[in-house]
């Protein structure tokens, strides 16, 4: 009986220590799709605007035509804009954890980091390579 209690206790501890991925795949797929659309608008605005953007948030606002409703699904997260010469990308982060990374120059959502071990919220894509 002592061994059974010990085994059950160990299993309980292991189950508690292994925290399941807290992100729902369906919700993350929806967010990735919306982020992809915004990233494409971001990239197009950067490439075809007469404005030389150095500030990511200004580029984001111009890309969504100041329609902040497009950002509502991301309210519990942080969106970071990456500008690398004539290319742009978006990072979706949960505090300092990178969830999704999307280069606006590609048709698909580029990196679904939320499925992997936690990564720091910083760009991992080399836009000069991805976008050429």
Go through the PLM ranges and name each one:
Residues 4-13:
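Sec-dependent N-terminal signal peptides
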Residues 10, 87, 99, 114-115, ...:
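Processing junctions and N-termini across compartments
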Residues 24-50:
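N-terminal alpha-helical signal peptides/signal-anchor transmembrane segments
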Residues 114-132:
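Short, low-complexity, Pro/Ser/Thr/Gly-rich segments in the mature regions of secreted, periplasmic
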Residues 21, 98, 110, 126-127:
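Mature cores of small secreted peptide/protein domains
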Residues 17-19:
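Bacterial signal peptide processing site
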Residues 40-43, 47-104, 109, 131-132:
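Extracellular/periplasmic head regions of type IV pilus-like filament subunits
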């Amino acid at each position: 009986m002592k061994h059974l209690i010990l085994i059950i206790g160990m299993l309980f501890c292991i189950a508690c220590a292994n925290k399941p991925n807290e992100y729902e795949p369906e919700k993350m797929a929806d967010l990735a799709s919306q982020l992809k659309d915004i990233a494409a608008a971001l990239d197009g605005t950067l490439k075809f605007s007469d404005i030389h953007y150095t500030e990511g948030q200004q580029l984001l606002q111009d890309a969504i035509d100041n329609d902040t409703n497009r950002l509502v699904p991301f309210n519990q997260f942080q969106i970071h804009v990456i500008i690398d010469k004539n290319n742009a990308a978006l990072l979706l982060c949960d505090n300092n954890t990178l969830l999704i990374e999307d280069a606006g120059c590609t048709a698909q959502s580029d990196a679904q980091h939320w499925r992997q071990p936690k990564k720091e919220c910083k760009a991992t894509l080399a836009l000069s390579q991805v976008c050429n």
